[in-house]
């Protein structure tokens, strides 16, 4: 018969193995949050998209339901209207954003894979918010560089959400800080990166976790030292760092 310690270790192992979208060490506590306050208030269209995404082989890439709820409320609190999203996947966080912003709000959405986006697009269209989305397929950096060169986009975005290639987060930040307005927010997802940011370098990790770990650590250090922003790192989902531009 397993001891309590063995059971806890086994639960922790399963927690990591399934790529859990929460840093809570108790699966029961996370399920309580989802079943008590997230799923009962989740819009039907977001539930449908979440269930569609769950069948995709890369479903670990999606935004968690609790983080989607958080983003939706945050956007309403800051009255965001002109937004950007880098890294779309099937569009769960994109739909959360589209539902939160006003009818004439806009989202510039960028991802290297249109096929994944089109998996969720019928749900987005059925929700009546597809007209708010300008989707661009391809790398985001050239688009950002062109926007900065044009000049008219400086300080024009109320909110920007980044959930893409972690090895480019620093490069995104260098550009996005010019495009978000003073008082606007940038949200960087996965900044606690499966909890690996506090793990010893030789700790057992999945290959992709180990590969991106140093890039996430570099980003966190850079954001903490950037005088142009105020920051708040939250243990929601896989960690999200909010950056408010102050100068």
From Swiss-Prot:
Transmembrane regions listed in the UniProt entry: none
CC cofactor: a divalent metal cation
InterPro entries according to UniProt: Cation-dep_OMT, SAM-dependent_MTases_sf, SAM_O-MeTrfase
Listed pathway(s): Aromatic compound metabolism; phenylpropanoid biosynthesis
Keywords: Lignin biosynthesis, Metal-binding, Methyltransferase, S-adenosyl-L-methionine, Transferase
PROSITE patterns attached to this UniProt entry: SAM_OMT_I
Stated name of the protein: Caffeoyl-CoA O-methyltransferase
SUPFAM superfamilies: S-adenosyl-L-methionine-dependent methyltransferases (SSF53335)
Organism per entry: Populus tremuloides
């Amino acid at each position: 018969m397993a001891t309590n310690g063995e059971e806890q270790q086994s639960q922790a192992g399963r927690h990591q193995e399934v790529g859990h979208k929460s840093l809570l060490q108790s699966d029961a506590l996370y399920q309580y949050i989802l079943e008590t306050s997230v799923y009962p208030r989740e819009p039907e269209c977001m539930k449908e998209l979440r269930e569609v995404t769950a069948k995709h082989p890369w479903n670990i890439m999606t935004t968690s339901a609790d983080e989607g709820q958080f983003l939706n409320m945050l956007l309403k609190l800051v009255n965001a209207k002109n937004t950007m999203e880098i890294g779309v996947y099937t569009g769960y966080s994109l739909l959360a954003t589209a539902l939160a912003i006003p009818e004439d709000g806009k989202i510039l959405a960028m991802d290297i894979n249109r096929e994944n986006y089109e998996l969720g697009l019928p749900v987005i269209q059925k929700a009546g918010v597809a007209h708010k989305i300008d989707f661009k397929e391809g790398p985001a950096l050239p688009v950002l560089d062109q926007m900065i060169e044009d000049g008219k986009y400086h300080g024009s975005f109320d909110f920007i959400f980044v959930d893409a290639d972690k090895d480019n987060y620093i490069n995104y930040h260098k550009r996005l800080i010019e495009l978000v307005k003073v008082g606007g927010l940038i949200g960087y997802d996965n900044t606690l990166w499966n909890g690996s940011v506090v793990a010893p370098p030789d700790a057992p990790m999945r290959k992709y976790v180990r590969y991106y770990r140093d890039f996430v650590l570099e980003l966190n250090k850079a954001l903490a030292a950037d005088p142009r922003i105020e920051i708040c790192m939250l243990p929601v989902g896989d960690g999200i760092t909010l950056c408010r531009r102050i100068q």
